[in-house]
Amino acid sequence: MQTQLDFWLWNSIISKTDCQKIIDRGLEQLDILQKEGFDSNATTFGDNHKTGTRSISQKDLTQQQLSENNINEKDVYIRDSRIAWLSDQWIYDLIWPWVYKSNNRSGWHYEFDYAEPAQFTIYDKDQFYGWHSDGPNDIHAVKRRKIPGVYDETHTDKALFAYADGLIGKVRKLSITLMLSDPNNYEGGNLKFDRGEHIKNRYEEISGGMVNQGSIVVFPSYKYHCVTPVTKGTRYSLVVWFNGRPMK
């Protein structure tokens, strides 16, 4: 294990057999989505949508650069990957213990009680995820249940899925990435953190050469990060967000 300013890394703690089972399950779910007419290409909000066209690939542009270049954020694809959603209990059983250990040993000590559906992600050659934060706007805290005489209807937004009732009033506290691929099977696709311009060594990059198949990276959801373009092969990963009440 290794601790850093922005993340906690557990190397090779999920077996290769279990990694392959997750990959197989994710590919199965992708096949179902495609048969139902849904596009597996991830949008900025992370959902699956009916097949459409995309315009600009953001890659390494920041929000400030988008503004300075008068690029409409709605015309930009901040990510280029394929995704499917998994809610199998056995997957959570593999992951939860390591999230708890990371939270305690790192000193973060966040309170959380809810895990969102796991996002199985495929990055093929030249695919990427630009700079972003998983929980910058308390995306679930603004949601409200329908209460007769108080709220006429449940307040939601386009990012709300069927599972979101358990997320109402909560924020993302911790994010995890489980590396499902053998690092010998792809190049690039590094998980990269931006510590801020005030830090001497501003960027921290976790490359395939640093982690083995079955490694888990845990980090606070507000941390600014990206996945660099894959230059060779295919990178499989699993992402899960852990939620709790604000300010705890």
Cite the ranges covered by each PLM segment.
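Fe(II)/2-oxoglutarate oxygenase catalytic core
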Residues: M1-V218, Y222-K248
